[in-house]
Design a protein with these regions (language model features):
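Metal-dependent phosphoester/phosphodiester hydrolase catalytic core
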Residues: 21-455
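Bacterial Sec-dependent N-terminal signal peptides
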Residues: 1-24, 455
């Protein structure tokens, strides 16, 4: 009798699971990605059973102006990430939105709203704001993880981030970690992106502010992967489907892009799609080898021209790996001498003001300072990790003289960056924040200290 009770209980459990799987459900989201003056992108992922998706939205100040936009994606696939564009919005306006699945509102435990950017140019001072940034988010999945101590740490850091008011969030690479079972097929790559984006603890953060992202090796493919990765096209498509940047590379290549907020321009670079293998010779006949690429010629031309075009107070170049650290023996643009020297020479020759590098990857945080004769110093702000294993600096890096004193953080953290001040007196402040919201380090730079003597 006891055996039959167990059998019946097991059968009922299986039936419940099957019914749940057959029911149209929201897998993750919704959240507002790229939000502009008159446009916003709403992202979500739904189960294969969902037949239709729509977004209903209205301005908080006037609910009678309710509108509905239908999703045009083909649904019913194994994975169904969707993006819905909301156009014709008013600037500096807060909107409430809800996701509609098969004509029924999807239930969420968090607020779903966004505020369009303000049209401040030629009208008022550049708005003060803050944003969040960081890298290396690892969620454990024991059946596929390496044996031993779990690599993923305390994911409550994402709740702390959700509780930190900010205008937007920049994911600086390794936003999810593909395993051996993932990066050998396109399906596996999509599985990892879908699974890691669906974690409950992420949802409120994603919905609380617009999201922007670059990638690094682990969300691109295998460890240290670059131009030779056989699934790089599939990986690019998956990255496009699970992020909401304004654009993705040029001519169907790469994922680099750009966006602006207030008087700051962000250059989202791609350090994977065009990147040569690290083992490739860095020099030939005593000269840096042009054949060893980091950004690649096309992206480098875009970056240079975008920097020349920019009138922003601060110009933040976001890279998955460090750019400036002379003591980084692992993955760093410095190890790609031709492009590294070319970029630094370009910045100097054109006397471009306000340049800062932001990077991830290292599993610790720090700020590297590189002096330049006759010009302002360059800084590389590294913020890592969110939840991946913490790395302790060793050997000569432990006493890195290029590191700004007081900026080394060797525990889980994220960055809260504030831009404030009067015109011509703007200040950018970086705070390294711990799991519980504690301050682990800080640094600031003034606009005037990143100026060149441009005529």
């Amino acid at each position: 009798m006891h055996f039959f009770k167990i059998l019946i209980a097991a059968f009922l459990f299986i039936q419940i699971k099957v019914n749940a799987q057959q029911k149209p459900v929201l897998i993750s989201g919704p959240w507002a990605g790229n939000v502009e003056l008159r446009n916003a992108t709403i992202w979500a992922e739904v189960s294969p059973q969902v037949k239709s998706v729509a977004v209903k939205f209205y301005p908080v100040s006037n609910p009678s102006l309710k509108k509905t936009v239908l999703c045009k994606n083909i649904l019913g696939n194994d994975f169904n990430p969707v993006k819905i564009e909301l156009n014709g919005l008013d600037f500096n306006t807060t909107y409430i939105y809800s996701l509609i699945l098969d004509a029924k509102p999807a239930n969420t435990s968090f607020a779903t709203k966004f505020t369009t950017k303000d049209l401040w140019q030629y009208r008022k001072p550049a708005p003060d704001f803050n944003f969040l940034a960081g890298s290396c988010a690892y969620f454990n999945e024991p059946v596929f993880d390496r044996p031993g101590k779990p690599y993923g740490g305390d994911s409550s850091i994402f709740e702390t981030m959700a509780n930190t008011p900010a205008s937007f969030h920049v994911w600086m690479g390794d936003n999810w970690y593909t395993r051996e079972v993932d990066f050998s097929t396109a399906w596996g790559l999509q599985y990892r992106a879908s699974r890691d984006r669906s974690h409950t603890i992420l949802q409120r953060l994603m919905a609380s502010m617009p999201q922007y992202a670059i990638w690094d090796d682990h969300d691109y493919g295998p460890n240290n992967a670059g131009i030779s990765y056989i699934f790089k096209e599939e990986s690019r498509n998956i990255f496009k489907n699970y992020t909401t940047n304004p654009s993705y590379g040029e001519e169907g290549k790469g994922i680099y892009s750009q966006f602006s907020y207030s008087d700051v321009d962000f250059f989202l670079t791609d350090n994977r799609y065009f990147r040569s293998e690290p083992e490739m010779a860095d020099s030939a006949e005593g000269k840096p080898s042009a054949g060893k690429t980091y950004f690649g010629a096309k992206q480098m031309e875009w970056l240079k021209n975008a920097l020349l075009h920019s009138q922003a107070t601060f110009k933040i170049i976001v890279s998955g790996s460090q750019v400036l650290n002379p003591l980084n023996k692992f993955e760093c643009m410095r190890l790609y001498s031709y492009e590294h020297e070319h970029l630094l020479h370009f910045l100097s020759a054109n006397k471009i003001s306000g340049v800062l590098f932001f990077s991830g990857d290292r599993h610790h945080s720090e700020i590297i300072k590189l002096e330049r004769p006759g010009l302002y110093p360059l800084y590389d702000v590294t913020i890592s990790p969110y939840t991946a294993g913490v790395s302790k600096v060793r050997d000569e890096e432990a006493k890195n003289l290029y590191r700004v004193s007081g900026t080394l953080v060797e525990e889980q953290n994220f960055g809260k960056i504030t831009v404030s001040g009067k015109k011509n007196e703007r200040i950018l402040h970086v705070g390294f924040i711990g799991i519980k919201g504690e301050k682990l380090g800080e640094w600031a730079v003034k606009e005037k200290d990143l100026k060149t003597n441009n005529p």
